[in-house]
């Protein structure tokens, strides 16, 4: 997990579930722009030209944390929770991203997606909805790895979803 505007809330949500230690490797809260480059490998030119609130920044944060933590999946949040605009972006502008494992047969990334959000509400509401949105995107990407038949078999084997 790589977090900016959510400041650790995504990691807190994941680790609130018993047994999370079996699947959760860790998180990086890169609130300061320069940490996005230094810790997560986000392109410095991209940050200088577009700022931290950008879809490519979110995608690079997700890929960077996946690599840094040697995880199968990386997720990231970046955006403007308010009360003031940032990097020319209005309050409520959020980008969430997922970066998934490589397909063994092709070496291509299987799960990779960035979503732009325009959220309303106060700072706390924007941050909460950002957490919900990035976790929903991760679930969507993980579920998309399975074909319909595999998913049906998994549901039967495990007694439901």
Q: Over which residues does each language-model region extend?
A:
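Short alpha-helical segments enriched in small residues
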Residues: 1-161
